[in-house]
Amino acid sequence: MMKKMLLAALLICAAGAGLADPVEGVWKTKPDDNGNFGHVQIKPCGAAFCGTLIRAFDGSGKEIASDNIGKNIIWDMVAYPDGFYDDGKVWSPDRDKTYNSDMTLAGNKLAVRGCMLGICRDGGTWSRVK
């Protein structure tokens, strides 16, 4: 009986492990102070989520080369109920600043916010690319 219960518990955990979190995917950022924006791929990293810049664009939407491609924009973001992610960091390339961050997911929109010393900066609403 105990073996059957243990096997059932393991199967439930294995089935749940295959489900992707809704925040996973590629997101288009809000334009920065220079009008540039990027595509950030969010995926699990340990027990949290990280986002890496995978493409960069100028204000007209033309893809541009950037030294920031491949750099983490988001890290240590922990999932909480109801589409809320917190306890992470976000790096703003245009200001070269790292902020304590939280995110709120609603469908294909991701509201990103960063705070430093009690002052918060709205990172804007990102749109799902895929």
What is the role of each PLM region?
Residues 1-5:
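Positively charged n-region of N-terminal signal peptides that target proteins for export
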Residues 6-10:
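Sec-dependent N-terminal signal peptides
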Residues 14-15:
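N-terminal signal peptide c-region/cleavage motif recognized by signal peptidases
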Residues 94-95, 100-103, 109-123:
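Short, exposed beta-strand-loop hairpins at the edges of beta-sheets
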